[in-house]
Amino acid sequence: MKKLNSCDGLYHDSLDVRFTKACDNRCPFCIEKNGVDEKGTNIEKMIESTIKSPKKDILILGGEPLLMLDKVYEYVKGIRSHVRNIYITTSLPINIVHDYEKFEAVMDMIDGLNVSLQHYDDDINNDIMRATRPHQRIGVLLKRICEDENHANKVRVSINLVKGAIDNQMSLDMFIRKMESIGVRHVKINELQHEEELYVSFEEIFKDKLKKSNIKLKSPYSHGCQREISLKDYDMKITLKRACFCVNGNLDATLSDMFKAFKKQFVKIEPTQAVLYENGDLASGWMTKE
């Protein structure tokens, strides 16, 4: 896998879709907490705007999009033949259990399901997310999804490194092994951005595992903040997304970072991000209340 830096404009063919601002969790580090207010979902306009957009990789986000499972199904069905890839990011709300047949129909049409978790223990995961409708989304629902061979291949589980939760080698090791045990085949490990007080360094807590696997991590800013790593202790695909000084004021820039930053002053990077809001409006980036 190529090492990626999203700030370098490499995701030029992606359309972020905020399907809804509604969510049944209240994560303290939610990246959408300062986003603009709910605009009211209009599926027909969303489908029309998506088809008109030149972007061909669609990432459906929230809030929690699968709270509106029927509308997600309608939207995905409406755009499927017009785009290349469709991905959904979710924390697996309980209403999936209540209409699992519709969820399976959505899974059959999409290319990837990005599942956001905060812990390997269901109760702790619910607590960290401040879930308003807690349920066994890992040991029961996620396991059920992964029992289907075709669906399991589409699942990627994302875990944030957060102080007080997954913040040391033992807890991260237990998380990865728990995912392996229920049939997950791909895990993405994220360092927090713009949350200095809660930040945990992957390189620091997993230094023994990295050494054992002969992996030396270089500056995420200069050499790619997202990359795949192959750790000897695990039989699964692992993607690592690290933070740099641009998104964490407590991190220092290396000499190579300063050189790259200097060069970027003379290289114009065209803005490539596009965001579709739930009312069908397209924007050149994520809008905030500020």
Task: Specify the residue positions occupied by each region the protein language model found.
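Acidic (Asp/Glu)-rich catalytic clusters
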Residues: T50-K52, F103-M109, K143-H151, M179-S181
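Radical SAM enzyme [4Fe-4S]-AdoMet core and its adjacent flexible, acidic
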Residues: K39-T41, D123-I128, T132-G139, K154-Q265, ...
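Canonical Radical SAM [4Fe-4S] cluster-binding loop centered on the CxxxCxxC motif
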Residues: M1-K45, S53
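Core AdoMet radical
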Residues: S14, I31-T41, K55-M68, H82-H98, ...
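Radical SAM enzyme core and accessory elements
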Residues: M1-G9, K260-E290
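Distinct, well-ordered alpha-helical segments
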Residues: D70-V76, I96-V106, I166-I176
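Surface-exposed amphipathic alpha-helices with a cationic face
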Residues: Y73-S81, L142-N153
